[in-house]
Amino acid sequence: DLKNIIYNLKDLSKHSQISLFVDNMKGNKVNYDAIDYAIYVGANLIEIHTGYFSKHIEEGNLSVINEIESLINKANKSNLMVNAGHDLNLINLPHLVKIGGINEVSIGHAIVIDALNYGFEATIKSYINTIKG
């Protein structure tokens, strides 16, 4: 089972960090079960799948900010580091950064698209400035 696999991986290297990729929503409710499960199996951190968050931010549904914030807060209070990624871009990333409590974000194809439109250097600077707040 996953708990034993994680235990064995950590036993191989005391510096191993085990992350689980989790959905922030389960149906129409915040997925707190993902945090409980991550703790149960011995993960050190979670990476929140931000596709749902990103879609709703771009549609103007800002209530999703409170939902993901409560998940991040619970994870942080449970001593889990939090990473986030999926469909993040310069439109929705500021909302996520403002919440705080996130160790790292993964930004994929949005950087490539923005770099094609605005140039690589300008795009990287924009993302760095956004992340720094």
Descriptions of predicted regions:
Residues 9-12, 38, 75, 96, ...:
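Generic structural signal for hydrophobic
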Residues 60-61, 114-133:
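C-terminal helical cap(s) of enzyme catalytic domains, especially alpha/beta-barrels
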